[in-house]
From Swiss-Prot:
Belongs to the manganese catalase family. It comes from Bacillus subtilis (strain 168). It holds the Pfam family Mn_catalase. CDD domains: Mn_catalase. The cotJ operon proteins affect spore coat composition. They are either required for the normal formation of the inner layers of the coat or are themselves structural components of the coat. InterPro entries: Ferritin-like, Ferritin-like_SF, Mn_catalase, Mn_catalase_dom. This is Protein CotJC.
Amino acid sequence: MWVYEKKLQYPVKVSTCNPTLAKYLIEQYGGADGELAAALRYLNQRYTIPDKVIGLLTDIGTEEFAHLEMIATMVYKLTKDATPEQLREAGLGDHYVNHDSALFYHNAAGVPFTASYIQAKGDPIADLYEDIAAEEKARATYQWLIDISDDPDLNDSLRFLREREIVHSMRFREAVEILKEERDKKKIF
């Protein structure tokens, strides 16, 4: 189906240890609009979508896992040299007590990932509109992370991710039009 290369989809650099920024980035790791939710949503929906757009959901769903890997790398690099005191001051004390430096799927507020973040209606057009909304929410979150970040190296990677969300949204919009045209061909008056 795909080939894994032992490199990130886009390079991730950070300027300095910054557990506070890592805490915010965790939103895209285990939050409702994050990369894990997107990957699982798209790969699940592909089983009830017409053949014409299955490949799109597969391609974007697997790319979301590459984005998840980038976010994990960012969080790791931003926290790898942090002391327990720095983690506590950044609001990651609860995380440290439960997971030490291990990543865990939760949002920036510490709420664990849940399947309720994922939607699959079974109506292909409805599901694609859900996917468009998911991509637009992710795009907005990446913009807000860029706005709050003071790390120019990290912002480069965040801009890459933001732009990929825009591309995904556009591709899902194209898929909606394909399915609408197909649906309209079947109407008999």
